[in-house]
């Protein structure tokens, strides 16, 4: 099963990715992990990526795509994979189609975890972190027993500056604009599957499981 996982910040992608790879024993391939592994192994593309990163420059598409090609050609991807964080653009998605064709494979589903942006705003702005021990809470979904006080160490809880409403709203807006062309691209190819991410996390996974179970 060859899957791509999509969703806006706060949609719960990480939780669902963990459950998918645990049940189906396929590698969870995130862009960051791919780059780190390629640079550590000193592959041709990894060394090229390192030369850009060391200069503080953006890694060009052809290098990123080369790293994806190297990674998807590895033995642990024979039974499938879960791509997370790639592709980000229609150009990258088109390049991925070519890679899959060359490998004699195809993308089975693009799973888009759908959550209303108002609910995402609530999820993302409700996070609170302990100044002392770093424990994470949520005002609505995982509140501390006593307001603004850490259950574990009694430290003071604070909101990160990038979790404030204006910053989060801007981040969501940028993400929505960036991902729409990609969602349209995959809808046209017939790969796109919309998953209701507003349910309980176990129900979200149950819906994904029903969809992808037949691919195993």
Curated annotation (Swiss-Prot):
Taxonomy, superkingdom: Bacteria
Pathway(s) it belongs to: Purine metabolism; AMP biosynthesis via salvage pathway; AMP from ADP: step 1/1
Binding site for AMP: 31, 36, 57-59, 85-88, 92, 160, 171
Enzyme superclass (EC): transferase
Annotated GO biological process: AMP salvage
Localization per Swiss-Prot or TrEMBL: Cytoplasm
Catalytic reaction list: AMP + ATP = 2 ADP
GO molecular function: adenylate kinase activity; ATP binding; zinc ion binding
Residues at which ATP binds: 10-15, 127, 136-137, 199
Entries under InterPro entries matching the protein: Adenyl_kin_sub (IPR006259), Adenylat/UMP-CMP_kin (IPR000850), Adenylat_kinase_CS (IPR033690), Adenylate_kinase_lid-dom (IPR007862), P-loop_NTPase (IPR027417)
GO CC, alphabetical: cytoplasm
Pfam families noted in UniProt: ADK, ADK_lid
Disulfide bonds: none
NMP as annotated region, ranges: 30-59
Coiled coil stretches, renumbered: none
EC number: 2.7.4.3
Entry keywords, A to Z: ATP-binding, Cytoplasm, Kinase, Metal-binding, Nucleotide biosynthesis, Nucleotide-binding, Transferase, Zinc
Entry binding sites for Zn(2+): 130, 133, 150, 153
Chain segments carrying region LID: 126-163
Xref: NCBIfam families: adk, PRK00279.1-2, PRK00279.1-3, PRK14527.1
Record family assignment: Belongs to the adenylate kinase family.
Protein purpose: Catalyzes the reversible transfer of the terminal phosphate group between ATP and AMP. Plays an important role in cellular energy homeostasis and in adenine nucleotide metabolism.
Complexes and interactors: Monomer.
Domain notes: Consists of three domains, a large central CORE domain and two small peripheral domains, NMPbind and LID, which undergo movements during catalysis. The LID domain closes over the site of phosphoryl transfer upon ATP binding. Assembling and dissambling the active center during each catalytic cycle provides an effective means to prevent ATP hydrolysis. Some bacteria have evolved a zinc-coordinating structure that stabilizes the LID domain.
Protein name: Adenylate kinase
Species for this entry: Bacillus cereus (strain AH187)
Lineage, highest ranks first: Bacteria, Bacillati, Bacillota, Bacilli, Bacillales
Gene that encodes it: adk
